[in-house]
Amino acid sequence: MHTYIVAGIRRDPRFSPHHEASDEAIFHLTAEALRARGCTVREYTEADLWADAVSADAVFGMARDPRSIRCLQRMEDGGLPVVNSGYAIARCGREPMTRLLTEADLPHPRSLILPTADDPVPALASAAIDACWVKRADGHVVGAGDVTFAASREVTREVFRRLSDDGIRTAVVNEHLTGDLVKFYGVAGTDFFYAFYPTATHHGKFGLEQVNGPARGIAYDADALRTTCHRAATVLGLRVYGGDCIVSDTDGLVRLIDFNDWPSFAPCREAAAPFIASCIIGSIGLRPGSYAPSGASSQK
């Protein structure tokens, strides 16, 4: 019987602001769950990807550096199963994600994609957006300034100036939604789905979850949330995912405000890891292949 060799790619700490230990924990638990299922797991860094030092029958990982994403895409193009897909990770950049979720008619805040060199106030007025969230459009969040709550159009103008001065050319603007903030985690093709109130557990990166205040327990349709999240994951091509939504305090509807490739699963990592391992093993069965670059010998 063939023993599958699975390469695990750790996330570079730059892409784990305030969550380095949590990201490392879910990576470790997933690797152990795969080993318990009979796989040989080789652990690599994102730098190993750039050096073409990865050899395996399949890859799982949390890479987010643009160079790493391109490496994963090349592996996929060569027939290697990769979870999450490099193409799916790229779609989780703010701009492509906003376009895709909007085009798929998924419940989502009114959003604009604007050049930071422009004055955003006319576009905000036209869209009837006042308080909003301003997010850099080019890739994943790596610092507190990459996502900013702007309480007014004038504040948004100031945020645009700062982003432009920092060399960020495009911003995504999401209208601010009032209501309960709910965070969720899921694994496609499995029964795993977990949702919770982050303010109740003090779970967050930069304290931005405090803008909406403590959860009030506004009633919402949990099955509808799960269905919406699975739909969004399918649109983006993600298999291991998480994100945030707002349960409206006016109509009780759930709207997605963020969607991520392979989050930390911090409050539920022990329960999630076996399902993630099953997802990875299932991908091997769906897309048999192997990848061994010439001279590859690095094994962590």
Question: PLM features: what roles do these ranges have?
Answer:
Residues 137, 176-177, 185, 244-246, ...:
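Anionic group-transfer/hydrolysis microenvironments
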